[in-house]
Amino acid sequence: MKPTDNNSYRHILKYMGIFGGVQGLNILMSIVRNKVVAVLLGTGGMGLISLFNTTVRLVSDSTNLGLSMSAVRELSAAYEQGDEERLKHRIQIIRMWVALTAIAGMLLCILLSPLLNRFTFSWGNHTLHFIALSPTIAFLALAAGETAILKATRQLRQLALQSVYGVLGALLTSIPLFYVWREAAIVPVIVLAAAIQWVLVIIFSLRRYPLKFSFKQTRLSEGYGMVRLGVAFVASGILASAADFIIRSYLSHAGDIQIVGLYNAGFMVTMTYGGMVFHAMETDFFPRLSGVKNLGGEFNKIVNRQIEASTMVISPLLVAMTVGLPILLPLLFSHAFLPVIDMMRGSILAMYLRAMTLPMEYIALSRGDSRHYLLQEAVAALLLVVAVIAGFHFGGLTATGYALTVASFLEFLFVLVYTYYIYGYRLSRHALLRFVFQFSLGLITLAAVLTLEGWLYWVAGALLLVVSIPHKVSLKFFHFK
């Protein structure tokens, strides 16, 4: 296969490396920020940040009309055809709709602030906090719209720089505020971080596509098709945010704010940090898959190659994370978060399954089948909520970690069967073999860290890490070229 083939392994790994590297750099800066915040605010402060952020995401996802995804599809068609005038026209339409959603989201947050306070917290009155957080909704919507423009027009360098600068800006501004005002700085820091992200993305976006605003009914009506497609993204975002909201509210009531902080730390490290290699899918894999007109052999090949590449890249990271948690967790946060290690070890296995499931979930998106995609997300959200509640009820945070893996396995089976019957997708033998091999290593690693101590712990971990790293023999065996 030619190196210029956008669906080749070389291309997939290249962009997974680029955006995974950017995410890694962002995470490195976030480590410093989280470490300082954990020391200054403790588990209670981390839990409070988690509750505010989760609620903000819920309101944001409920009001942005899914434009961050549907706009990419809308603009990509004009960009690929080289029609500059049509592209600029569509950008104006998207910016009008984004501005409307930003205003609506901010006002809705203000109006619903008493209800948000009631359902989020079991103590105190945080209504004014939610009112103060309302500009965050507008900043997030505006930033998402401009980011969609950069993605659709393949401004990869600008996307990477904006991401890095945004995290750096949040780091440099939040630490002094937390140091001086402690928990009182939480709301201002959240608003300021969103504002910094918005300012940075418009700097890059407006350089290439200057702002030309004109609110006309005819132009707004041209965006109805894009909005209809985005409704499914909104619904899926609401489901995901609602699931997070329900989980953290349940933990807040069934446990306490410290439990929420511990769960958030464990979930963040395993699902967010561990999933940094998946970042390229939205930017690179989704547009490529959308460009394939017909289902069949070539379509299946693209999905299977993405699964193989994702499994290959993430597996060594997961082994290293499983082994290194006793060092990694205090480094990321503080020793007060060590009780969540067993939960994290159980949930890391879910990331292997995520590497299989996520590329298949993009199939429905690439076909524009909003109902099928929404059904997949509904099942995933339901499984997540049931798993966390059941796990915490029967075995505390530790059981919650293993319950997350069980939920991910059930989600994988559902998506695999569903995409087969709807789209004729077939998981290749090579992709399945690679997954079985790496998942088995993950199970062996888990058994090793639970049973071994001292130097045997580290020697076994190092050997398993070496085995998980792809090399010439394994690549040849799996026909990975």
Where do the protein language model's features map onto the residues?
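Membrane-proximal transmembrane or re-entrant/amphipathic helices at the cytosolic face
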Residues: K2-N6, L446-K481
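Interhelical loop/hinge segments that connect adjacent transmembrane helices in multipass membrane
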Residues: M1-I12, V201-D244, D284-K301, I422-V436, ...
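Transmembrane helical elements of multi-pass membrane transporters/channels
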Residues: K14-N34, M46, G166, I190-Q197, ...
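Alpha-helical transmembrane segments of multi-pass membrane transport and lipid-handling proteins
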Residues: Q92-F121, L171-L172, Y179, V277, ...
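Helix-loop junctions and terminal segments of transmembrane helices
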Residues: L65-Q81, A152, G266, T270-I307, ...
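Membrane-interface junctions at transmembrane-helix termini in multi-pass inner-membrane proteins
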Residues: A138-Q162, I348-V379, T419-I422
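Membrane-water interface segments that mark the loop-to-transmembrane alpha-helix transition
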Residues: K14-N26, F52, D61-P114, L128, ...
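Hydrophobic alpha-helical transmembrane segments
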Residues: T127, I131, A160-R208, G225-R228, ...
